[in-house]
Amino acid sequence: MKATPLLLCLACSALAAPPTKKQPEPAEPLPALEKNTIAIDGHPESVAADAEGNIYFTCIGSRLTPTEKDKDGYLGVIPHGSTEPKKITDVDTLDAPKGYQDGFLYCTDVDMVFKINAKTGAIEGYVDLSPSRMKFLNDLAFINGRLMVSSTDTNQIFYVDTNTSSYGELVTKQPIYKPNGLAWDPERKVIYLCEYATDEKGKPSGRLLSINPVSREVTELSKERGQYDGLVYRDNALYYSDWSKDKKPEAVRRLDLKTGRSAPVATGPVEGAADFILYDSMMVVPGMTEKKIHIMPIGGKK
């Protein structure tokens, strides 16, 4: 989250002209990322980048067991300009961590949410959701300033507060199934959600949805179906990863929210495209099943 500066203005006299409003400083350009594929020790699930171009990632460990408490998950960083990943936390610290936001790593870990210092790896807050009996807390996103988490196995989404260790459910008016990626649209004031779901025959049935956090109404955004994972909102469009299009450029797609049209944007195959990010003109995509992180240009027409 961005800190808001507090400006103190002193009036010199009753006739003094009103102070000129200070304009915000232009954002510094992000350091460029080069196209690359980086091998990871374990299965990477989510990524994020800071203003210095360092890429943080969460790894569920050597085995693809995101719902088990096996103590082999860890957090790592790929320093800008390097292709050598480094571990931030010890390998026995976490079970299946996922998610990152802002200057801290906010990790969903089976039935817990942790707030972890991105530089030191120290745990600075947590929320225990085990009383709700879930085993697959998944994506994290700041929704209008509040941290929200999806619970894929119990078909729920929660607001969580790592400072007070409290949480509460956002109960939608229409059902959601296997919720995964979350994103916030500050213009429309809605939550975007994608589902990692299949029907009774094993056919992909996940939807792209919007949720009004006030009315709690759920709206379907597209007739497409998939096994959706990562979700990013940018410039009136949704970018989303789809496990049903594994190993194809369609593994990451873009939905134009004005026209309803979608198109592939990955510029190379990814095996197990998980919780990705957009970084200027590039995307950083974890290849969860192939134990790699891909840095590639964003393709497709806008």
Residue ranges, per PLM feature:
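Beta-rich, blade/repeat-based domains predominating
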Residues: D41-E52, T89-L105, S130-M148, P175-V190, ...
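A short loop-to-beta-strand structural motif that recurs across blades of beta-propeller domains
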Residues: P66, K71-G76, M112-F114, Q156-F158, ...
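Hydrophobic alpha-helical segments and helix pairs
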Residues: M112-T162
